Amino acid sequence: MAFVIGRRFSFAAAHHLAGLPAGHKCSRTHGHTYEVEVQLASPALDAAGFVADYQTLEPLRHYLDCDLDHRDLNEVLPFQPSCENIARHLFGWCQGNLPSGALVTAVRVSESPQSWAEYHAGPNTGASRPAVTP
């Protein structure tokens, strides 16, 4: 059993996806208001009764606001900016940049209220080291 908490963030950005069939709407530059949900887990609570203080996630807010918000993701990310790849990237970013006590278990990225992708800790991602980020 474990306690799980989450926090949502949003950012607006444009992108296009290369390699799609001619005429596919995602092959044209378009934008989304992305919703990012990060989940942290712990088998026990700390002395304050927290899995982690939500302030632990402020570096992620800063990264989203300063590096991704109102940008063309094709210009600022070194990979095809699909929702799946963005989720994997943010998972790895969190593991590498948040305080070591914060056990990130999943990152979900929504590009619309109906569409999302999630990358989560599993047997091949490890809990203490960043996942391979494209």
For each predicted feature, which ranges?
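Charge-rich, low-complexity N-terminal segments
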Residues: 1-134
